[in-house]
Design a protein with these regions (language model features):
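A glycine-rich beta-to-alpha transition motif near the start of alpha/beta enzyme domains, typified by
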Residues: 50-56, 81-107
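Short, hinge-like loop/turn segments at secondary-structure boundaries
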Residues: 24-25, 100-102, 126-127
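Single conserved hydrophobic/aromatic residue that forms the stacking wall/gate
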Residues: 129-138
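Short acidic, glycine/serine/threonine-rich loops at helix termini
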Residues: 17-20, 96, 123
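Glycine-rich phosphate/adenosyl-contacting loop at the front of the ribokinase-like
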Residues: 1-84
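Short, glycine/serine-rich, charged loops/turns that create anion-binding
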Residues: 12, 88, 137
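Conserved phosphate-binding/catalytic loop of the ribokinase/pfkB sugar-kinase fold
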Residues: 86, 108-113, 121-130
């Protein structure tokens, strides 16, 4: 099978929350720079996800990562695309692969039975900034 674009990259699930400036200031106190990407421990990220869910509900979810974003965009513009990546056999890994397929991107990925989870990226969006507190072990 011939593809227009093949990518190799990290399989990330973006969890996007809308936030206000008050939460942005609280993030800065935690050492999370506004408008940047910050690696954080899994427990800290889970605590923030729980806090944001309590404040505003469930996040929007999408497969993500730099290569994934590129291959999905190309697919949505009509290119025949393929993504090569690694995911764990967990909810995020399954969601990632389903979302790739839903966006017309081929893959041959089989989820690994791993102690390391598929990585989520917490995307916080305010009216002025996009901030990425992330953790991606697989």
């Amino acid at each position: 099978m011939k593809y227009d674009l093949c990518c190799l990259g990290s399989a990330i699930v973006d969890l996007t929350f809308q936030i206000d400036e008050k939460f942005t200031r609280e993030n800065e106190k935690r050492g999370i720079a506004k408008g940047g990407m910050t690696l954080m421990e899994k427990n800290d990220q889970n605590n923030m996800i729980n806090e944001l869910t309590e404040l505003g509900g469930l996040p929007e979810k999408a497969c993500g990562g730099s290569a994934t974003n590129s291959v999905v965009a190309a697919s949505l513009f009509g290119s025949k695309c393929y993504m090569s990546c690694i995911v764990a056999n967990d909810a995020n890994g399954k969601f990632y692969l389903e979302d790739l397929s839903k966006n017309g991107v081929g893959h041959g990925t089989k989820p690994l039975n791993s102690e390391l989870p598929s990585g989520p990226c917490l995307v916080t969006v305010s009216y002025t900034h996009l901030t990425l507190p992330t953790n991606h072990p697989v």
